[in-house]
Amino acid sequence: MSLSITHEKSLIDNYIWILFDKSKAIVIDPGESEKIINFLDKNNLTLEFIFLTHGHCDHTKGVFSLKEKFPNASLFVPIGLELGLGESIIKEGDELNLLNSTFNVLELPGHTDNHIGIMYKDNLFCGDVLFSAGCGRVGSNYKDMYLSLKKIKSMDDKTKIYFSHEYTLDNLKFAHYIDPKNKNIINYIEVFKEKPDTVSAPTTLLLEKEINPFLRLSENIDIKNKINNEFDAFVYLRKLKDKFNSI
């Protein structure tokens, strides 16, 4: 039996992911706690497990209150993240059986040097590594982020991508700037014009291969200054995106 998956919007543009069965729940990246507790209480759910993909406060701040209310909930964190809450470290290759379901851990450094992703069936919870039509800012080094995106790109096209921020419209504007004739990008922008509050998560890997410039490096290989390899193209695009709003 598959777990149900839903989200709560958090802070300005965060998504907190909740997976649950009839009585128990798993929470991923709780940037705040009140909405999560309300959801759990409303649905008579006990919080059993918490995952953190990385240590930024907009993904972790709610964990302290959640552990106060649910002290028996197990907390899983990447290597190097110490919160003093009895957390368990998880790493690449770990397989966890939770709520009669299998979860696999992927190391996806780049946004932070210890960032992880969580795979449940064909669902990837990727934190701040990949967004729809974009990717996270580089906080460790460009090579790490490039390789993490390549790892995701190698997955099955049917993979559902559960990212942690609703940046899609801004990302699409940059994608259109880079690839102005891409009809898939143009059509997706129209969706947001018609429904500005569109929730774009989860996306699919297939869609991202059509619209996301950071997964289309071979298509963008000769942009602007005739870059001739994918890694340099990635670095160029990521730096350009960092200053795009001022262009």
UniProtKB/Swiss-Prot annotation:
It catalyses: an S-(2-hydroxyacyl)glutathione + H2O = a 2-hydroxy carboxylate + glutathione + H(+). Pathway: Secondary metabolite metabolism; methylglyoxal degradation; (R)-lactate from methylglyoxal: step 2/2. The keyword Hydrolase applies. One of its GO terms (biological process) is methylglyoxal catabolic process to D-lactate via S-lactoyl-glutathione. One of its GO terms (molecular function) is hydroxyacylglutathione hydrolase activity. Its EC number is 3.1.2.6. SUPFAM superfamilies: Metallo-hydrolase/oxidoreductase. Pfam families: HAGH_C (PF16123), Lactamase_B (PF00753). Gene3D superfamilies: Ribonuclease Z/Hydroxyacylglutathione hydrolase-like. Its cofactor is Zn(2+). Zn(2+) 2 binds at residues 58-59, 128, 165. Binds 2 Zn(2+) ions per subunit. Zn(2+) 1 binds at residues 54, 56, 111, 128. It is an enzyme of class 3 (hydrolase). Keywords: Hydrolase, Metal-binding, Zinc. Monomer. Belongs to the metallo-beta-lactamase superfamily. Glyoxalase II family. Thiolesterase that catalyzes the hydrolysis of S-D-lactoyl-glutathione to form glutathione and D-lactic acid. This is Hydroxyacylglutathione hydrolase 1. It comes from Vibrio vulnificus (strain YJ016).
